[in-house]
From Swiss-Prot:
Entry similarity comment: Belongs to the glycosyl hydrolase 5 (cellulase A) family.
Keyword DNA-binding applies: no
Full protein name: Probable glucan 1,3-beta-glucosidase A
Keywords in alphabetical order: Carbohydrate metabolism, Cell wall biogenesis/degradation, Disulfide bond, Glycosidase, Hydrolase, Manganese, Metal-binding, Polysaccharide degradation, Secreted, Signal
Localization in the cell: Secreted
Catalytic activity of the protein: Successive hydrolysis of beta-D-glucose units from the non-reducing ends of (1->3)-beta-D-glucans, releasing alpha-glucose
EC id: 3.2.1.58
PANTHER family: GLUCAN 1,3-BETA-GLUCOSIDASE I_II-RELATED, GLUCAN ENDO-1,6-BETA-GLUCOSIDASE B
One cellular component (GO) term of this entry: cell surface
Signal peptide segment: 1-22
Disulfide bonds listed in the record: 291-415, 316-342
Length: 416
């Protein structure tokens, strides 16, 4: 998480290209002894903000560290190794527990996607990060096994940052693909693969890298070469494991012909609050946009999972655009026009919203469920926050805004 730059033209182009290049949506990967058939439907949720921090998911951790702490790099640099290890260990041991995995399964999910940074397995000299995350990832694999869930392990942050977003560990310029950063990423991925891919009864897939930012400057040719190296690593360790490949903010159809039939799943993310056009839409426009996106991804010749999406339609959540960065919705960001007032949407629970806002949120969620299950399913972002209406699945479930059971519809046939 998260796509954070405006790309109205790119979104429109992707929709046009994706529909124009559409191929039958029931394309299949080579049949192998996988623990999950990704030609089927993924229904799951991300465990965001746990083993890779994001200021908007746990703002208290960053507020307590002072103004300089805007990502995990600056947080650990500000606190120092000892204090950072103490703060993060407390967070890792309490934010997510075994009970969360059982609640996810009880809600009808079959998958969790768990972000992890390279620094957890392959720390580099002179970097401030602390390790210790793998103990908790080990626990998560056991909890998923006990709950009957499949796991996608997601390499969420790479050396140098592959997207410049705070969720990569370090906000700022994109330096991935410079120097030795790609080989360092392969080393980190290999360490994760060697540790977890043998547990194929639970770890059904592993993601090569989260959100490499091609529009932001990542070389597409270099990314394809990196994906080739990652596929080789997986084949060497456990060829029954599927590999998730991010679309890099291109249309999924633009990857047609690349590794088709190799147990590869395209991962695409869809948010409607980081673009000036999309954030301006009313609920009817948001529903149509989600349904159109569902049609677009059918143009892929590989399985496609929408690996991140949300029930929110504004960027009002505290620190969503980054710590200290204002909102587009209220017209405070980069001289944007004002679209509305954030009101109760900055923090707290979806229960604090008006009846109409809750109904619209449910309607938007239902449209996305229908749209994404038209291909190969979805992974909601995210399971838990300190209070972010529209983003917090457990809060949405508790307040009847996320369907339970998942097939329940108050707004049926929106994408028909």
């Amino acid at each position: 998480m998260i796509f954070k730059f405006s790309q109205k033209a790119l979104v429109a182009l992707c929709l046009v290209v994706g529909l124009a290049e559409a191929v039958p949506s029931k394309s299949r990967v080579v049949s192998r002894a996988s623990t999950f058939d990704y030609n089927g439907i993924v229904r799951g949720v991300n465990i965001g903000g746990w083993l890779v921090l994001e200021p908007w998911i746990t703002p208290s951790i960053f507020d307590n560290a002072g103004d300089a702490a805007v990502d995990e790099w600056t947080l650990t640099a500000t606190l120092g190794q000892d204090q950072a290890k103490a703060v993060l260990s407390q967070h890792w041991s309490t934010f997510i527990t075994q009970g969360d995995f059982h609640r996810i399964a009880q809600a009808g999910m079959n998958h969790v996607r768990i972000p992890i940074g390279y620094w957890a397995v392959s720390s580099l000299p002179d970097e401030p990060y602390v390790d210790g995350q793998l103990e908790y990832l080990d626990n998560a694999i056991s909890w998923a096994r006990d709950a009957g869930l499949k796991v996608v392990i997601d390499l969420h942050g790479a050396p140098g940052s592959q997207n410049g977003f705070d969720n990569s560990g370090r906000k700022g310029p994109i330096a991935w693909q410079q120097g030795n950063t790609v080989s360092q990423t392969v080393d980190a991925f290999r360490a994760l693969a060697e540790r977890y891919l043998p547990q194929s009864d639970v770890v059904a897939a592993i993601e090569a890298l989260n959100e490499p930012n091609i529009p932001g400057g990542v070389s597409e040719a270099g990314l394809r070469d990196y994906y080739d190296q990652i596929a080789d690593v997986v084949r060497q360790i456990n060829p029954d494991t599927s590999v998730f490949l991010s679309d890099g903010f291109l249309s999924t159809a633009s990857w047609n012909g690349f590794k088709t039939g190799e147990d590869v799943v395209m991962d695409t993310h869809h948010y409607e609050m980081f673009d000036n056009y999309l954030i301006s839409l009313d609920i009817h426009g948001h529903v149509k946009s989600a349904c159109d996106f569902g049609k677009q991804i059918k143009g892929s010749d590989k399985p496609v999972v929408v690996g991140e999406w949300s029930g929110a339609v504004t960027d009002c959540t505290k620190y969503l655009n980054g710590k200290g960065v204002p909102t587009r919705y209220q017209g405070e960001y980069a001289n944007n026009p004002k679209y509305g007032d954030c009101g109760d949407k900055t923090q707290g629970s979806v229960a604090d919203l008006s009846d109409q806002e809750r109904a619209d949120t449910r309607r938007f969620i239902e449209a996305q469920l229908d749209a994404y299950e038209g291909k190969n399913g979805w992974l909601f972002w995210t399971w838990k926050t300190e209070g972010a209406p529209g983003w917090d699945m457990q809060d949405l479930l508790a307040n009847g805004v996320f369907p339970s059971p998942l097939t329940d519809r108050q707004f049926p046939n929106q994408c028909a």
